Every structure is written in structure tokens, then in C-alpha cells.
Amino acid sequence: MAGVSSESLTAALVALEAKLPFASLQLAKELFGILGTVDSSAGLRRALTDPSRSGDEKSALVKQLFGGKVSTDAAEIASGLAGSRWASARDIGDALETLAASVVIAVAENKSAVSASGITGLEALENDLFAFNHAVDSSHEVQRALSEPQASPAAKIALAEKLVPNASEEAKVLIGQAVSHPRGLKATNLVRRFAELAAKRQQRWIATVSVTRPLTESQTGRLQAGLNALYGRELKINMNVDPALIGGIRIQVGDEVVDASLLTRLGQLQRQLAG
């Protein structure tokens, strides 16, 4: 997805972010359901991506089709997409799929640690998705069964759940979507895409810290506390030592490089680390 479609998807993801702390699997299932309706009707896809129709007109069409049949949030998200600009009829479906998967991923992220080892819901989701793909890749028979056009979606979902019986509910939703509605892809390729979305969200909360020399335990603790305060949650720190680094320290959280102004907001972090 590129150009105007990419811009529309980015805007939709930004708008979705406000709903994610309270996201539910039901919302994701509703969005996947809307996607199924859109994918099943070439006429509807054309209507929703027709550049000659106004955004308000296309949004109203979605509200007319789905109002009262899905939650207010689902209808709002779908109508927002319809009111945006798309380069191709396929792109709006791809965007719906991405938003629905993002909701599932957020539900997993919102879970607290789920095991004695401290693994998070997001990590568990990624592990389950990888386990499913490994199970499929290890069996030609399973691959044939999942690609059999005569097999029902329900049968494929049942087979998938047998492959990863202990998977989280979030993983089951994404895997079920991939095997029942792969949208022209191999199911494992779509699951891999979902895993990449989860990994990207996980990366947002990893601080990669490059320093010219190893930090002491005390310095690392102050750095951790400062970053946690800045981002409003506990970050995982990956420490790299680079003697050639200019400036003594470089911090990157997800796609964001923590610049001098942010370091100042951390309470003169550089001076603290030097102490």
C-alpha cells in the first residue's frame, strides 16, 4: 500500500489508538465481519472507493449498511475508512484487516503477565502465531487441507485450533481469520503479517540505548526510571556499547530517537548518568 492509501491508513491507525486501551475481541471480530462483507461485494468496494463520491456520502453508506448491526465503535471505524481516499478498491479491505488485527494485538498487549516466567500477552500472541506457522510448515498434509477450496471455513478453523490447542484467544482470532479468509494469500503468510504487526507494536516499548561505555547499575536504574516517566509505562532496555558514538548516549524508542529536548525533560539525564 502506497501513496494516498498509505496516508489514509496511517490516519486511521492514529485515530484508532484512542480506542485501544479499552479494545475488545468483539470489536475486532466485528471489523473482520465488515471486511468479509466488503470483500464479498465488488460493487460495494467500488462504491466505497469511487473518487467521484464525497467522503461524507461514502461514510453515510457504511452507516446505513452496518448501523445497528455492529457496535458504535466498529461502525465509526468503518465509516471513517470509507470517508478516506484509496488508490484501489483492494486497499480499503487491506486497511480494515490491519485495523482489526491491530485491535486484537492491543487486547493481547493490555493483558498483564500471563505466566510465572513473566511473559506478556503480546509476547504470548507472537509465540502462538509462530507456533502455528511452524506446525503448518512441518506438514504437507496440513498445508493441503488449509488450501483446499472445497473445505469450509469452519473446518479450516477447527484444524487450525488442533495445531495450537493452547493458543490464546487473541491468537485464535487471528489464526482463524487467516485460515478462513486469507484474501488471496497463503494462511501462513497472513499469519506472518499479523506477527509482524505485533512485533512492530512490541518494538514501540523497547528502548535501544547506545553508550560509549557500559553504565553502572545505578546509572541504568536512573535511566530506566527516567524513560518510564517520560513514556508513562515500563520500557524494556536493550543496551549497546559503541565507543565511537558522538555525544556519549543515543536512545531510540520504537521509531523515535530521544533528542536533546527529551533528554532535558528527563531531568538532565546526561548529567545524572555522568554522576
UniProtKB/Swiss-Prot annotation:
Top-rank taxon, per record: Bacteria
Key word Cytoplasm present: no
Bilayer topology: Peripheral membrane protein
Coiled-coil annotated spans: none
Keyword terms of this UniProt record: ATP synthesis, Cell membrane, CF(1), Hydrogen ion transport, Ion transport, Membrane, Transport
Molecular function per GO: proton-transporting ATP synthase activity, rotational mechanism
KW Oxidoreductase (keyword) present: no
Protein location: Cell membrane
GO cellular component term of the entry, any: plasma membrane
PROSITE patterns: ATPASE_DELTA
UniProt similarity note: Belongs to the ATPase delta chain family.
Subunit structure: F-type ATPases have 2 components, F(1) - the catalytic core - and F(0) - the membrane proton channel. F(1) has five subunits: alpha(3), beta(3), gamma(1), delta(1), epsilon(1). F(0) has three main subunits: a(1), b(2) and c(10-14). The alpha and beta chains form an alternating ring which encloses part of the gamma chain. F(1) is attached to F(0) by a central stalk formed by the gamma and epsilon chains, while a peripheral stalk is formed by the delta and b chains.
Known function: F(1)F(0) ATP synthase produces ATP from ADP in the presence of a proton or sodium gradient. F-type ATPases consist of two structural domains, F(1) containing the extramembraneous catalytic core and F(0) containing the membrane proton channel, linked together by a central stalk and a peripheral stalk. During catalysis, ATP synthesis in the catalytic domain of F(1) is coupled via a rotary mechanism of the central stalk subunits to proton translocation.
Protein name in UniProt: ATP synthase subunit delta
Gene from which this protein is expressed: atpH
